[in-house]
A protein has these predicted regions:
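Amide-donor transfer/coupling interface in amidating biosynthetic enzymes
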Residues: 99-137
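Flexible, glycine-rich phosphate/dinucleotide-binding loops
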Residues: 12, 35, 80, 114, ...
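Short, polar loop motifs at secondary-structure junctions
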Residues: 11-12, 30-31, 75-78, 134
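N-terminal beta1-alpha1 cap of cysteine-dependent amidohydrolase-like domains
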Residues: 1-56, 62, 120
Length: 137
């Protein structure tokens, strides 16, 4: 089995890391020809308006809209798979509210303190709090 990772923008490197750690075969998808031979596609988080434009410009939008490839979308990927006021792929019957927790400009970083010994002595790390979408229905 081989999974494609949509590599136009967003959290691509984080998906590479996890797939390697799990021993999953994958390759990046940037053009329609990159869809050949994959059993599924992951659409990582990022910025949905930018991602939509890149998908359309690359020719991938038309291919994905056919609905012939299983797709897992996180954050911006989920926004584009579901139904919302924007132009979406509409492949998953869910209603998505973009920026449900505020505008992206309101995202921030803050230090998080862990009250556990489960992370090899790490007690603090920088947390990134984004204004994520919300699945409403």
């Amino acid at each position: 089995m081989e999974i494609g990772i949509l590599a136009l923008q967003g959290s691509v490197s984080e998906h590479h890391m996890i797939f390697r750690k799990c021993g999953v075969a994958f390759h990046d998808v940037r053009l329609p020809k990159d869809l050949n031979g994959i059993n599924g596609l992951v659409m990582p988080g990022g910025e949905s308006t930018t991602l939509r434009k890149l998908l359309k410009n690359s020719g991938l939008w038309k291919e994905l809209k056919k609905g012939t490839i299983p797709i897992l979308g996180t954050c911006a990927g989920a926004v584009l798979l579901g139904n919302c006021d924007d132009d979406t792929l509409g492949l998953v019957n869910i209603d998505i509210l973009r920026n449900a927790y505020g505008r992206q400009i309101d995202s921030f970083e803050s230090e998080i303190t862990l009250e556990t010994d489960e992370f090899d002595g790490i007690s603090k790390f920088p947390g990134v709090f984004i204004r994520a979408p919300q699945i409403e229905n």
